[in-house]
Regions:
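Bacterial N-terminal signal peptides that target proteins for export
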Residues: 1-9
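Hydrophobic helical h-region of N-terminal Sec-dependent signal peptides
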Residues: 8-16
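Sec/Tat signal peptide C-region and signal peptidase I cleavage site
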Residues: 17-24
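A contiguous strand-loop segment
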Residues: 24-122, 162
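A short, charged
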Residues: 69-83, 141-145, 149, 205-216
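Alpha/propeptide regions of enzymes that mature by internal proteolysis
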Residues: 123-155
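Active-site periphery "cap/insert" segments of enzyme catalytic domains
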Residues: 145-171, 176-179
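Extended amphipathic alpha-helical segments with heptad-repeat/coiled-coil character used for oligomerization
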Residues: 165-216
């Protein structure tokens, strides 16, 4: 199944460190009659222009995970798949992108509800920052099942303790989509047949809230 990406950078403003809950990104998924899948999103901020960059990463490119306080010894990974994306401030921090296998990944603002495991220097080689997670996903995986298996061996951490948490939307070439949230240090995968994701509260809350509108 073909996967196509649309990037919408609408009223963009400041980074996650200083954003407030009134700024809400929205992701949607459309399916065409021929079986194609289109994932799209807005990036809705409101204050000042963000330093966004378009990023193209080829197969074979090696990155090192950025750790808190510029600590050394971060996990290294070499791209199995080339990918393109919209970066925030630097090339490693991909907000939204897709790889050549047809898998797409995106992050969305998730303040007050998410909580990662604390950074442990002894586990630096297994740690990936929340803002670098999309890049790691796009570089390494073609399907959600592959990603889920690999998640058992990594720790998602907060690079900057001042920043709020994020959650992620992953869509693979089959059209399957999941939402990933880290709450109280635990990684949660939620199938997302609705194909819609916004910011906080948690995905289960949004799913339950739909019951209030089923009769409209």
């Amino acid at each position: 199944m073909e996967t196509r990406k649309l990037f919408y950078a609408l009223a963009v403003a400041m980074p996650l460190v200083a954003a407030n809950s009134a700024d809400a990104c929205t992701g949607i998924t459309l399916k065409s009659d021929d079986g194609g899948v289109v994932v799209a999103r807005t990036i809705d901020w409101s204050r000042e222009e963000m330093d966004n960059i378009y990023v193209v990463i080829p197969r074979g490119y090696t990155q090192t995970a950025i750790l808190p306080n510029n600590a050394s010894g971060g996990m290294q990974y070499t791209a199995k798949y080339g990918y393109v994306g919209l970066g925030m401030e630097q090339a490693e921090f991909i907000v939204d992108g897709t790889n050549e296998a047809g898998l797409s990944a995106a992050l969305f603002y998730f303040p007050k509800y998410g909580k990662y495991k604390p950074y442990d220097a002894a586990l630096a080689g297994q740690s990936i920052g929340d803002l670098q997670f999309v890049s790691w996903v796009l570089a390494n995986f073609a399907t959600i099942d592959e990603l889920r298996a690999a998640m058992q061996n990594i720790r998602i951490i907060n690079i900057d303790s001042r920043a709020d948490t994020v959650h992620w939307r992953i869509t693979d070439p089959s059209g399957r989509q999941v939402v990933i949230e880290v709450v109280d240090g635990e990684v949660n995968f939620y199938d997302n047949p609705m194909g819609v994701l916004t910011n906080a509260p948690s995905f289960p809350w949004h799913r339950s809230n739909l019951n209030n509108y089923v009769n409209l």
